[in-house]
Amino acid sequence: MLFPETVWRIPMKDKAVYLTFDDGPIPEVTPWVLDMLDKYGIKATFFCVGDNVRKHPETYAEVLRRGHSVGNHTMHHLQGSIVRRKRYIADIEEAHGYIDSALFRPPHGLIRWKQAAAIKDNMRIVMYDLVTRDYSKKLNGEQVLDNVKRYVRNGSIVVFHDSLKAEKNLRYALPRAIEWLQENGYRFLPIPM
């Protein structure tokens, strides 16, 4: 396995999934996500961009206040495959000044071996096995929902985005995905920090 310490899904005997949200927090979308999660009694994990936490500390504080777990998604949403290791690690460390978590998810799911090796002793790299593609302009909300229905399995780590780019599809797909998953016997867990 390329990155044996990396978590792609968390297999379980009973039906459970891990909802995760990347790229926030932002005041235009994240509070709505929090309200949806509260409505359904769900705890999730938010992989936050440090610069968004810096700009919107009250939104980040609300994520924590409502009992969700958080992870580091770099300071500036850097794509690891095109950035040198030293710069990438510095960006992660800068974000850590705003985000107190040992969880890390590389933006775009891309990280080089040397970058992963540099952080593996201090951080747990959490990827995903189901990306909803809610950010895609080529998909509508129904297609995003279909991605969840088609690809979910026990222990899936599901990625949505609390971002402006994903907002339209997210607002359609998230409540419907939650309801469908509940109807099909899934429970929801945050990724332990």
Q: Across the structure, where does each feature detected by a protein language model lie?
A:
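N-terminal pre-catalytic segment of deacetylase/amide-hydrolase enzymes
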Residues: 1-20, 25-41, 55-58, 176-193
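Metal-dependent polysaccharide deacetylase catalytic core of the NodB/CE4 family, i.e.
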Residues: 16-17, 27, 38-165
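Charged catalytic carboxylate motif
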Residues: 32, 91, 173
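Catalytic grooves of carbohydrate-active enzymes
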Residues: 148-192
